[in-house]
Amino acid sequence: MRFRIRKCPSCGRYTLKETCPVCGTKTKIAHPPRFSPEDPYGEYRRRLKREQLGIVKR
């Protein structure tokens, strides 16, 4: 069994549980995804980020 530290997005506390023991919000894994030079979804992720920030690609 492998434990990953998790972080509550609302209060910012770290825990190993699925829900925050302080506020009850669902926690998220605090680690970034693994890096891969052959990133199969990189193009889509960058496009989504540009759309969210309102950047127009020229």
Curated annotation (Swiss-Prot):
Transmembrane segments: none annotated. This is Ribosome biogenesis protein Nop10. InterPro entries: H/ACA_rnp_Nop10 (IPR007264), H/ACA_rnp_Nop10_sf (IPR036756), Nop10_arc-typ (IPR023532). GO terms for molecular function: snoRNA binding. SUPFAM superfamilies: Nop10-like SnoRNP. Belongs to the NOP10 family. It comes from Thermococcus onnurineus (strain NA1). The keyword rRNA processing applies.
